[in-house]
UniProtKB/Swiss-Prot annotation:
It is an enzyme of class 3 (hydrolase). This is 3-aminoacrylate deaminase RutC. The gene is rutC. It comes from the Bacteria. Involved in pyrimidine catabolism. Catalyzes the deamination of 3-aminoacrylate to malonic semialdehyde, a reaction that can also occur spontaneously. RutC may facilitate the reaction and modulate the metabolic fitness, rather than catalyzing essential functions. Belongs to the RutC family. HAMAP family: RutC (MF_00831). CDD domains: YjgF_YER057c_UK114_family. It catalyses: (Z)-3-aminoacrylate + H2O + H(+) = 3-oxopropanoate + NH4(+). It comes from Pseudomonas savastanoi pv. phaseolicola (strain 1448A / Race 6). One of its GO terms (biological process) is uracil catabolic process.
């Protein structure tokens, strides 16, 4: 097995020892992605719609850096702080996965920063 770190240009420097994506044997694992700017500050505070879009754009960047598209995403793990944001998250999510939908789960939980309303981790099969 060959493992390769996937780090898009201009990516936020992680606050822990991990990379945005890791590719092995055609499978891309995208780390839990939060609505952070380049300095690890939460963006769009209080706006679940904008935070979801920011997170999915970041995931898209990782997938594209690995040579794939969002159509290659086969699984998403979604964590939201407040279940009241579920419909907003789904509305934005549907924009990024308009065709064949990936499998997923969604849970409500606390996140690493209190201003963060969403975190998504993904798996994609590329090639």
């Amino acid at each position: 097995m060959t493992k390769k770190a996937i780090i898009p240009a201009g990516t936020t420097k992680p606050i822990a020892p991990f990379v945005p994506g890791s590719m092995a044997d055609g499978v891309l694992y995208v780390s839990g992605t939060l609505p952070f700017d380049k300095d690890n500050n939460v963006v769009h505070v209080g706006d679940a719609t904008a935070q979801t879009r920011h997170v999915l754009e970041t995931i898209k960047s990782v997938v594209e850096t690995a040579g794939g598209t969002m159509d290659d995403v086969t699984f998403n793990m979604i964590m939201i702080r407040d279940w009241a944001d579920y419909a907003k998250v789904n509305e934005v999510y549907a924009e990024y996965f308009a065709g064949e939908k990936p499998a997923r789960y969604c849970i409500q939980c606390g996140l690493v920063k209190p201003e963060a309303l969403i975190e998504i981790a993904s798996i994609a099969h590329i090639g």
